[in-house]
Structures are given as structure tokens and as C-alpha cells.
Amino acid sequence: MADLITVARPYAEALMGWRKRAARNRPGRMHCRRLPAMIADVQAQAFLTDPERRDAEKVSLLSAVPVAVDVKAWKAFLALLIHNDRWPATAEIGTLFADAMRRAEGVVDVLVTSAIALDAGQKTAVQSALERRFAGHKVRFREAVDAALIGGLVIHTGDLTIDASVRGQVQQLARTLRS
């Protein structure tokens, strides 16, 4: 199967479109969390991969997840996932949908990875720079440590990665020297 994020993107976008068009009872984050949790169950996976089961039975299983949305539309969405054999991508669909919801609400999730833990002053400086970079959005800052970076930072949000690490600079130099 193709990369799950690539497979999941159009389904997450469809959910966002549905959310934007619906006046009320819109799909929310909770619906996209419950479904992957159900699919993670070994028995559910066995049921969904059973070639003897009809698509309607599989949709019936997945639609047992309680939702506060238009049930007919939700079942149609689930039927599409089943028919196209995209149900394994539900976790990624949920993640992408939640990301899109946060963006629509003006929130940008940023993961900042450094070689050593940032002190309070460094965190403040990075947070300020990110808020300037993503003006008009609330920046939700998460931090990780990866000693393999040697020094510097790697900033990741959505499709954007800024690699200002020593490791990244060394790798770039190596690529330049090879070409």
C-alpha cells in the first residue's frame, strides 16, 4: 500500500470539507480518535481483513462507533474507506484531520528538536521567533532532545522542516562534496 499519510490526506480533507459544509453535527476530533482505536483491536482487524465478510458487514462494525454527526453521511464515509481498502489509514486520517482542525482554529503545532534540552531563555527566544514566523497563529510548542543533532535545532511543523542542526549542515556539506 502507498505511504499511509499520502493515502490518508484526501480522506482527511474530505472530512474537513464535510465539517465546513455542515451547519451543525460536524465531525469532530473525537470521532477520528475512536475509529482508529477500534481498528487497532486485533479482532476488528481480523474481521475487516476477512475476505468472507461483505463490505456492508464491515461498515456495520465500524459504524458501531458512537458519533454525534449525520449517521448516513458517516456510514457513507466508512463505506468509502472499506470499499477502497483504506481503513488501515484511519489513524493517519485522524491525525491529519486533527491537524487541519487546529490550523482552521489558528493553531500551529511545532516540534523543536535540539541536541540538549533548551533552557528557559532559549525556549522563549525560539517561541518568539516561531510566533513571528507564523504570525496570526497561536504556536503550540513541543520540545524533543536528540543528541545525534550535535548542536542547533530542527523545527518541524506539518510539511515544513527547518534543519539548523550541526548534523544537518554536515550532511548538506557531504551532499555538496559528492555532487
From Swiss-Prot:
In what way does this protein cross or attach to the membrane?
Peripheral membrane protein
Cell inner membrane as UniProt keyword: yes
Location in the cell: Cell inner membrane
Give one GO molecular function term.
proton-transporting ATP synthase activity, rotational mechanism
Q: Which UniProt keywords apply?
A: ATP synthesis, Cell inner membrane, Cell membrane, CF(1), Hydrogen ion transport, Ion transport, Membrane, Transport
Instruction: Fetch the PROSITE patterns from UniProt.
Output: ATPASE_DELTA
One CC-aspect GO term? proton-transporting ATP synthase complex
Q: Does the keyword Zinc apply?
A: no
> Which family does the entry's similarity section mention?
Belongs to the ATPase delta chain family.
Subunit and partners? F-type ATPases have 2 components, F(1) - the catalytic core - and F(0) - the membrane proton channel. F(1) has five subunits: alpha(3), beta(3), gamma(1), delta(1), epsilon(1). F(0) has three main subunits: a(1), b(2) and c(10-14). The alpha and beta chains form an alternating ring which encloses part of the gamma chain. F(1) is attached to F(0) by a central stalk formed by the gamma and epsilon chains, while a peripheral stalk is formed by the delta and b chains.
Q: What does this protein do?
A: F(1)F(0) ATP synthase produces ATP from ADP in the presence of a proton or sodium gradient. F-type ATPases consist of two structural domains, F(1) containing the extramembraneous catalytic core and F(0) containing the membrane proton channel, linked together by a central stalk and a peripheral stalk. During catalysis, ATP synthesis in the catalytic domain of F(1) is coupled via a rotary mechanism of the central stalk subunits to proton translocation.
Q: What is this protein called?
A: ATP synthase subunit delta
Q: Can you name the source organism? A: Acidithiobacillus ferridurans
Its encoding gene is what?
Answer: atpH
